[in-house]
Every structure is written in structure tokens, then in C-alpha cells.
């Protein structure tokens, strides 16, 4: 008996039609943004660092590298005092905006069920920004003065017998002004995150017997932390770079690093101004980096 050998033919593989190589679309999409960052962020920072090592004389600046401006900065009580004042006021304003902004965001983002009303309330928070920044700052002067509205009201209701002089032209007035101006930057991100919380989760916790504070501690606060971090970054960057509010509301009694930079630039002392700018940039970068370690925004948002 003979066996017929059968052969199994392998399928013939046909080559895919060749297509002309296209340029990397991702690189093309990133190129404008990267170029913009290099020209308007990286290059100015590098130039500022470079100028901070130039030789500063009384009437001019020479491109001769030296550490004299850095030594002057860290050996001067004026500069170090301004650095400490900047950090102190930033911490106080950050806490005050959080204490004022979180309850407002909680009401707008969670308790107000009507989306139209919630949006309208957020718009009301933004309305002051339709006016000039300087007008919003100077508007506090008639409010905080010795014969201002706050002192008059407190005297009318009998809480005080003499005007409170510390309300204006002091560090307190700067803190009050900054808190009011920048509070909206804390309210917005927190309200956005609170608005994303599924109401059924809170209802389930209530059905299981959880009270408000336990729900807040275990559900609301953790889910709103990305908004808190984003708001804290917004407030921190703007407060650390402040100079106008302190100049207008403190009568130049409060010196921030921003005020030092403005003064040095006005005096044509570019090296000293650059040193203060580098220190301020490092401080801002450290603050933002520390806050980003609290919450991974790429996963949470």
C-alpha cells in the first residue's frame, strides 16, 4: 500500500504597500510650545542667573563675573528681612485664603444643586477682576483707615471706643488685601473638584450612619485635595511675586522681595535685582514642587 505524500503549502506573505515616511507629528505639535518655553521662560531665567554674577558698581554694571552681589544679598539684614517677610506673609495669606475660600467653595460646589445658580455665584466671585488690580487694592484704604468704614462700624456697635490704627499701613492691611484679592483663585479649583463628587457616594455614607464631619473627613476632603493643591499653587505664585499690594497698603513699611526687585531695577542695580529674582524663582519652584508631591495632579485631574 502506498501512501500519498501531501504537502501543506504555506500562505504567501504579501508585503504591505510602502507609504512615504511622514514627519513625527508629535514633534511638530510640541515644537511651538517648546520654542515658546525656551524663548520666554528658560532663556530669561538663564539670563537672570548670568546677570546676577556681574560686577555692580555705583553707576554702572560690568559683565565681569563675581560673587559680590550674592555676598551682599546674604549678608544684608535688609535683603534677608525682606525674604523672611515674604515667606511669612505668603504662609499667612495661603492659610487665610484656604480658611475663607474652602467654605465658600464647599457651598458653591457641593451644597448648591442648581448648576445655573452655582455658575452665577462663581461669576460673582470673578466680577471684582473686571476692574483694575490697582483699583481693587486702593479700595481698601477708605475701608481700613482710622475714619474708614470698618472702624466706624465697630465704634457704632460699641465694640471699640478708639479707632484701630493698625488696620491700615501695616502688615495686617497687606494680609487683608491679599486675602481678598487672591481668595477667588482658591475658591475656583476647589469648587470644581467638589462639583465632580458623585452625590450617591455621600448618600450611601449617610445611609450607613456617617455624620457630616466623618463624611467630610473621609470623602469630601480627600476628593477635593487636587483643587486645594491647584489653588494653593495659584495663590503662592502670585503672593510670592507681590509688590504692588504691599506698597499701596503698608505705606512702604512692609518690604517684600518683589519691592526689593522694583527698587533695585529703578536704581539701575541690575545685578542686585537679578540676585533677588533668582532667589525668588528658586523659592517659587521649591514651593510648587513641594505642593505637587502632596497630590499627583496627572492622575487626579
Please give the residue ranges for each predicted region.
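Short membrane-interfacial helix/loop motifs at transmembrane-helix boundaries
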Residues: 42-77, 143-148, 247-252, 301
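Non-cytoplasmic
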Residues: 44-52, 56, 137, 142, ...
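Transmembrane alpha-helices
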Residues: 32-43, 127, 180, 185-199, ...
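Interhelical loop and adjacent transmembrane-helix boundary motif
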Residues: 11, 15-25, 57, 70-78, ...
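C-terminal transmembrane helix and the adjacent membrane-cytosol boundary/short C-terminal tail
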Residues: 2-11, 108, 191-202, 206, ...
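Transmembrane-helix boundary motif in ABC transporter permease subunits
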Residues: 18, 92-125, 199-201, 292-296
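Transmembrane alpha-helical segments of polytopic membrane transport and secretion proteins
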Residues: 1-31, 113-118, 290-301
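Membrane-interfacial helix termini and adjacent extracytoplasmic/periplasmic loops
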Residues: 67, 137-179, 213, 249-252
Amino acid at each position: 500500500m502506498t501512501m500519498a505524500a501531501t504537502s501543506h503549502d504555506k500562505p504567501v506573505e504579501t508585503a504591505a504597500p510602502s507609504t512615504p515616511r511622514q514627519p513625527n507629528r508629535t514633534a511638530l505639535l510640541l515644537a511651538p510650545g517648546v520654542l515658546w518655553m525656551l524663548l520666554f521662560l528658560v532663556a530669561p531665567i538663564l539670563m537672570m542667573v548670568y546677570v546676577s554674577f556681574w560686577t555692580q558698581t555705583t553707576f554702572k554694571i560690568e559683565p565681569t563675573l563675581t560673587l559680590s552681589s550674592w555676598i551682599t544679598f546674604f549678608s544684608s539684614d535688609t535683603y534677608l528681612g525682606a525674604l523672611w517677610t515674604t515667606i511669612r506673609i505668603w504662609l499667612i495669606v495661603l492659610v487665610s485664603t484656604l480658611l475663607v475660600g474652602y467654605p465658600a467653595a464647599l457651598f458653591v460646589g457641593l451644597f448648591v444643586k442648581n448648576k445655573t445658580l452655582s455658575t452665577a455665584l462663581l461669576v460673582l466671585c470673578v466680577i471684582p477682576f473686571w476692574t483694575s488690580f490697582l483699583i481693587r487694592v486702593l479700595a481698601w484704604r477708605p475701608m481700613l483707615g482710622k475714619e474708614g468704614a470698618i472702624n466706624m462700624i465697630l465704634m457704632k456697635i460699641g465694640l471699640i471706643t478708639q479707632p484701630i490704627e493698625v488696620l491700615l499701613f501695616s502688615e495686617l492691611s497687606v494680609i487683608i488685601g491679599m486675602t481678598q484679592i487672591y481668595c477667588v483663585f482658591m475658591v475656583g479649583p476647589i469648587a470644581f473638584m467638589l462639583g465632580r463628587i458623585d452625590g450617591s457616594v455621600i448618600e450611601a455614607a449617610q445611609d450607613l450612619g456617617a455624620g457630616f464631619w466623618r463624611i467630610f473627613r473621609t470623602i469630601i476632603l480627600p476628593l477635593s485635595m487636587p483643587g486645594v493643591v491647584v489653588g494653593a499653587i495659584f495663590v503662592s505664585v502670585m503672593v510670592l511675586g507681590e509688590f504692588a499690594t504691599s506698597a499701596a497698603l503698608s505705606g512702604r513699611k512692609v518690604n517684600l522681595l518683589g519691592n526689593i526687585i522694583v527698587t533695585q531695577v529703578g536704581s539701575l542695580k541690575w545685578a542686585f535685582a537679578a540676585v533677588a529674582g533668582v532667589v525668588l524663582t528658586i523659592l517659587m519652584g521649591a514651593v510648587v514642587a513641594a505642593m505637587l508631591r502632596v497630590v499627583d495632579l496627572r492622575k487626579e485631574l
